[in-house]
Each structure stands twice: as structure tokens, then as C-alpha cells.
């Protein structure tokens, strides 16, 4: 499945149906009076979080969504039917922004969550509504009100427990493929990973989700390489596993390069718990390994984990370290997802403005 994490979408709710101008006509009733019914309300545009999706690719092929208009009113004071709704189905972790792509409307973090993006227009009143003591036979009715139309942005931030970060070819995809059933592309050239990958790791009966994102290089926050656009996918994680390849000539500099890019991006990434690991250690002899481990320890301020996904060295220790932080964060609630289930202004009932 192809990956898309941002989409621009045009939506329009249905117009309200027009009220009817009608008079009661029955045998032996000369002046039956008005009986025009009200128009039906236009259909709404909703967004719904569904299970089984991890991309916005469907919105590459359809960007326009329009709900149906309400049915017009009819005689015998029959109200028109409401227009059919349109539902945009999105993955967990989707954020909705205004057209400026900056103003957040809603952050959808739970399966089954629904939110009304655009309310249908009210139906117009039929002429029966306007009957009064001074106007026994009104000959006018209201048209239906127009529905709402707007352009919005959908932005996906994958929800994972732990995120893998590092320079290109640091062994992130190999680590993910080794500890989960994910099958990311793995090759010996930079930027093999072009989009985020998710996998479920299990250790001592505990499962958690890992996210692998494309590698960062110096200047990524300014668009160098693939840039830092995928860092949003690790914003929601509880812990980062920072892999530094043992094949780097200067592992300390490699570590600081990625840390600088995380700091430049912001989003609280540098405040997250971080586990540092020297990866691909199977390519070094013992003397070189000690030297680089010491250099990396000096850069990050603590002894790094030593691991090799290819040789299955240190994998269990890394998974247990991740699990411990995830469990601790879950119990403490410090990194829980924000509760944005409060109604937006579009969910609040508006005053009847058909008059």
C-alpha cells in the first residue's frame, strides 16, 4: 500500500430543501388553507476514524466530497427528507486543519471517533408556517439555506509507542524487520526508507508499536535530503530509540547531528526519553568497538546499548529498555495523548436563521 500522510480536501454540505407553496384541495372544502411543508435539511459532511488504515492515499484519487441537498417540502404539510450524509474515513492519528494548514480543527486519536466537518443547510419553511390571523392564505415560502463549503487539510501522525531515529543507513529498518513482522525495504544506500513503517514488537508477553522513519541528515529541517516532514510521526511516541551506526567514522558527531535536527524541528522531541544504541557492531573488532562506544558515551552522556540486528546481538536488551519506559510512561500518564473530544464550533447547534 502506498503511503500518503497529507491531503487537501474540498468539502460541501448539502443545501436545505425549499419550502412548498401548497393549498389544501378537497371536495366540499372551498377554502382549505395553506398546507405547504418545510424543506428537508441538507446532508452533513463527517469524518470518522476507522480501523485498518495507516495512510491517506484514498484522498489522492478523490479530493471533492459533497453531501446531498435536502428534499423539497410537499403538500399536506409533508416535510422533505434530510439529504444523505458524506463520511470521510481516516486512520487513527489524523489531524484536521483549516485551509491555512496551521489552524487545528480536530485531532482524531481514537477508533470510532466522529466529527462533523460541515453541517447541512436548514430547509426552508413552507407556506403553512406563515399562516396567521391576518394572512390566511400566504403564497410564499422560504428557499433552503445553503450548506457550508470549505477546504481543509488532513494530516496523518502515526500513533506508535516508540520511534526509531538516526542517520540514513543506521540500521533502523533492519532493526524493525528483525523484531517485528514488518518488511521495510532494506538496502545498502542512503534513504532506502522513503516513508514511515510500523511494526508490532513483543517482549516478555508485552506488545508495543514501533515506528521507523526515513533517516535525517544535517540540514533536514531546511529541507536537505528528505527533510524533516516525517518527524511528525514520532511526535506521539513515548520513547525514541536513537541508532548510531558503528560504521560511522565519527559516531559522536553522527549522534549530535540527529539531535540538532530533532531540536530544530521542535514538537517536544528532544524532551522525550531517549535510548541510544550503537548499531551494526558486528562489523567492528573488539578494540574498535570499545573505542567507538566510548566516543558515543561521551557525546550522549551515558553508556550506549550495543546491538546488531543482523547478528541478533543486544536485541532483547533494547526491547526491554523500550518496554520499561513505555510501561512507566503509561502508568504515569505524562505522555498520554491529548483528549480532543470536546465539540468544535461546527458541532454546536446554531440558531434557526431561516426567517
Curated annotation (Swiss-Prot):
Q: Could you give a single Gene Ontology term from the biological process aspect?
A: ribosome biogenesis
Residues binding GTP are: 166-173, 191-195, 212-215, 279-282, 308-310
SUPFAM superfamilies with a match to the protein in the record: Obg GTP-binding protein N-terminal domain (SSF82051), P-loop containing nucleoside triphosphate hydrolases (SSF52540)
Question: What GO annotations for molecular function exist for this entry?
Answer: GTP binding; GTPase activity; magnesium ion binding
Q: Which cofactor does it need?
A: Mg(2+)
Where is this chain's protein located in or outside the cell?
A: Cytoplasm
InterPro entries xref list: G_OBG, GTP-bd, GTP-bd_Obg/CgtA, GTP1-OBG_CS, GTP1_OBG_dom, GTP1_OBG_dom_sf, OBG_GTPase, P-loop_NTPase
Renumbered to this chain, region (Disordered) spans: 333-355
Its Enzyme Commission number(s) read 3.6.5.-
What Gene3D superfamilies does the database record attribute to this sequence?
GTP1/OBG domain (2.70.210.12), P-loop containing nucleotide triphosphate hydrolases (3.40.50.300)
Q: Which residues form the OBG-type G domain?
A: 160-327
One Pfam family cited in the UniProt record for this chain: MMR_HSR1
Q: Does the keyword Metal-binding apply?
A: yes
A Gene Ontology cellular component where this protein is annotated is:
cytoplasm
What are the binding positions for Mg(2+) in this chain?
173, 193
The UniProt entry lists the main location of this chain as: cytoplasm
Q: List the disulfide bonds.
A: none
What CDD domains does its record include? Obg
Entry keyword set:
Cytoplasm, GTP-binding, Hydrolase, Magnesium, Metal-binding, Nucleotide-binding
Q: What is its quaternary makeup?
A: Monomer.
Q: What does this protein do?
A: An essential GTPase which binds GTP, GDP and possibly (p)ppGpp with moderate affinity, with high nucleotide exchange rates and a fairly low GTP hydrolysis rate. Plays a role in control of the cell cycle, stress response, ribosome biogenesis and in those bacteria that undergo differentiation, in morphogenesis control.
Regarding protein family, the annotation reads:
Belongs to the TRAFAC class OBG-HflX-like GTPase superfamily. OBG GTPase family.
- The entry's protein name is GTPase Obg
Encoded by which gene? obg
Amino acid at each position: 500500500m502506498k503511503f500518503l500522510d497529507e491531503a487537501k480536501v474540498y468539502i460541501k454540505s448539502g443545501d436545505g430543501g425549499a419550502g412548498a407553496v401548497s393549498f389544501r384541495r378537497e371536495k366540499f372544502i372551498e377554502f382549505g388553507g395553506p398546507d405547504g411543508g418545510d424543506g428537508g435539511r441538507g446532508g452533513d459532511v463527517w469524518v470518522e476514524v476507522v480501523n485498518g488504515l495507516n495512510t491517506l492515499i484514498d484522498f489522492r484519487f478523490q479530493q471533492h466530497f459533497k453531501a446531498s441537498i435536502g428534499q423539497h417540502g410537499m403538500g399536506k404539510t409533508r416535510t422533505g427528507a434530510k439529504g444523505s450524509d458524506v463520511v470521510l474515513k481516516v486512520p487513527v492519528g489524523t489531524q484536521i486543519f483549516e485551509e491555512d494548514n496551521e489552524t487545528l480543527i480536530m485531532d482524531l486519536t481514537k477508533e470510532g471517533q466522529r466529527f462533523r466537518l460541515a453541517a447541512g443547510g436548514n430547509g426552508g419553511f413552507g407556506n403553512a408556517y406563515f399562516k396567521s390571523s391576518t394572512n390566511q392564505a400566504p403564497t410564499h415560502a422560504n428557499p433552503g439555506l445553503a450548506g457550508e463549503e470549505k477546504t481543509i487539510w488532513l494530516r496523518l501522525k502515526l500513533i506508535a509507542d516508540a520511534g526509531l531515529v538516526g542517520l540514513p543507513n543506521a540500521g533502523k529498518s533492519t532493526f524493525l524487520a528483525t523484531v517485528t513482522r514488518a518488511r521495510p525495504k532494506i538496502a545498502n544506500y542512503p534513504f532506502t526508507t522513503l516513508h514511515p513503517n510500523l511494526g508490532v514488537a513483543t517482549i516478555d508477553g508485552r506488545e508495543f508499536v514501533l515506528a521507523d522513519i526515513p533517516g535525517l541528515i544535517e540540514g533536514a529541517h531546511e529541507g536537505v535530503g528528505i527533510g524533516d516532514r516525517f518527524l511528525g510521526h514520532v511526535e506521539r511516541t513515548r520513547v525514541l530509540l536513537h541508532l548510531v551506526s558503528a560504521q560511522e567514522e565519527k559516531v559522536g558527531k553522527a549522534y549530535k547531528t540527529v539531535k540538532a535536527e530533532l531540536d530544530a524541528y521542535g514538537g517536544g522531541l528532544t524532551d522525550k526519553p531517549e535510548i541510544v544504541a550503537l548499531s551494526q557492531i558486528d562489523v567492528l573488532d573488539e578494540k574498535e568497538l570499545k573505542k567507538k562506544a566510548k566516543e558515543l558515551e561521551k557525546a550522549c552522556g551515558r553508556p550506549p546499548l550495543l546491538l546488531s540486528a543482523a547478528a541478533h546481538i543486544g536485541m532483547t536488551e533494547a526491547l526491554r529498555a523500550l518496554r520499561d519506559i513505555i510501561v512507566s510512561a503509561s502508568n504515569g500518564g505524562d505522555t498520554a495523548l491529548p483528549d480532543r473530544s470536546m465539540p468544535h464550533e461546527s458541532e454546536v447547534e446554531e440558531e434557526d436563521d431561516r426567517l
